[in-house]
Amino acid sequence: MIWHVQNENFILDSTRIFMKAFHLLLFHGSFIFPECILIFGLILLLMIDSTSDQKDIPWLYFISSTSLVMSIAALLFRWREEPMISFSGNFQTNNFNEIFQFLILLCSTLCIPLSVEYIECTEMAITEFLLFVLTATLGGMFLCGANDLITIFVAPECFSLCSYLLSGYTKRDVRSNEATTKYLLMGGASSSILVHGFSWLYGSSGGEIELQEIVNGLINTQMYNSPGISIALIFITVGIGFKLSPAPSHQWTPDVYEGSPTPVVAFLSVTSKVAASALATRIFDIPFYFSSNEWHLLLEILAILSMILGNLIAITQTSMKRMLAYSSIGQIGYVIIGIIVGDSNDGYASMITYMLFYISMNLGTFACIVLFGLRTGTDNIRDYAGLYTKDPFLALSLALCLLSLGGLPPLAGFFGKLHLFWCGWQAGLYFLVSIGLLTSVVSIYYYLKIIKLLMTGRNQEITPHVRNYRRSPLRSNNSIELSMIVCVIASTIPGISMNPIIAIAQDTLFF
């Protein structure tokens, strides 16, 4: 009898919870419709994987890519709608958040074709790989729209857990296992530091968790200039620093880049930067509005260290992926300039524009690395010598992406950096912009060093990897080359038409 009553109570409680969740989804689901499309794609992948004995690989890729493209279409369809707060204050939808969600979806859409042949050659589990990519994308999208401390903590953890699993996906590779262990340990430590900073923010504001309510709480409690806020700022900056990977929070980056599967590195190198930048802009600009001088100083130090250390250490690297790891550390220093400038002087617009170009430049470079690695089995920079004599198309594509990363005119990277530095100069960040210009020259040096190797025709410099280079006859190469062509075009042509891109970015500058 007692068991029967308890069972009925359990059923009633479960029904209430389900009805409440259904009610929230029914009345607020339109606000997270792009995320719902991804969730439906995830469910569809799981259903196909559990019901089908034979894996239809093209069909799995089609479902993943279609769900991402449909999410992008849903975002564009609701462009310029009024900002709304939904799910009892957990999420906020506006153009500023949606532009970051668009960038994350764009990264994932371009990364999936890069992984097709790689996964087939390495015989990795396909369904799980796609599930992790889509789930990480979902976590990044929720992070961009998060409006309270709990969601801001849970969403990046969803992204991070999938990132840990993806970085260690090649379980037989010792380097991959080592990279995953370091990534997991440092990621766990940074998450604990971040949540500790949130606890100081929560207590100082009188128990508020929504971002705008935290500001109101700090005003009511007169704690907006207290030592507690300074402590919260330091801990949160360190926690976000791990996600952005500026110096000195960059130790995990080179090992993870070198040890992880190359398509995974391509995915993490852009999506993590976009998601962390979205988090940084909202956290620093809203709850720490009254501490702008303090967090400006902290970010300036991080930007200077990142630009100097990242670009100087990149010169000495012999692995292409490690070189790009240190290059990305330097690149995030440029992005931080836009975060510091903020809403004034088009700082956010310049940051968004540069990140759009960075996605195309970086993914284009990684597409070339994936293709070269599959055909030669090496990642050593020295082994790229003479590639132009065997595969001019691949060599020219890699050269264009590297030159754009370095910021040479008239490529997109040059105009992106020019606008970013100009906004920083107008905001009075003269020293920071000067460091950025000098380190950009340093980056051009090591990019040109690689391009010189690509174009060499002297037999004594060409390694056996290029001498025995053969273009793969596999049809699946087309997907990698398609992503590569799209990224190369996006790294070159948009630089000529900067004004429309900047104008679109400027339209997103409201919260």
Curated annotation (Swiss-Prot):
Principal localisation: plastid
Gene Ontology molecular function terms on file: NADH dehydrogenase (ubiquinone) activity; quinone binding
Subunit details: NDH is composed of at least 16 different subunits, 5 of which are encoded in the nucleus.
EC number(s) from the headed UniProt entry: 7.1.1.-
UniProt superkingdom: Eukaryota
InterPro entries: NADH-Q_OxRdtase_suN/2, ND/Mrp_TM, Ndh2_N
Reported function: NDH shuttles electrons from NAD(P)H:plastoquinone, via FMN and iron-sulfur (Fe-S) centers, to quinones in the photosynthetic chain and possibly in a chloroplast respiratory chain. The immediate electron acceptor for the enzyme in this species is believed to be plastoquinone. Couples the redox reaction to proton translocation, and thus conserves the redox energy in a proton gradient.
Family note: Belongs to the complex I subunit 2 family.
TM segment ranges: 24-44, 57-77, 99-119, 124-144, 149-169, 183-203, 227-247, 295-315, 323-343, 354-374, 395-415, 418-438, 484-504
Pfam families hit by this protein: Ndh2_N, Proton_antipo_M
UniProt keyword Chloroplast present: yes
Catalytic reaction annotation: a plastoquinone + NADH + (n+1) H(+)(in) = a plastoquinol + NAD(+) + n H(+)(out); a plastoquinone + NADPH + (n+1) H(+)(in) = a plastoquinol + NADP(+) + n H(+)(out)
Keywords in alphabetical order: Chloroplast, Membrane, NAD, NADP, Plastid, Plastoquinone, Quinone, Thylakoid, Translocase, Transmembrane, Transmembrane helix, Transport
The name this protein goes by in its record: NAD(P)H-quinone oxidoreductase subunit 2 A, chloroplastic
Stretches of the chain forming a coiled coil according to its record: none
UniProt keyword Transport, yes or no: yes
Cell compartment(s), UniProt: Plastid, Chloroplast thylakoid membrane
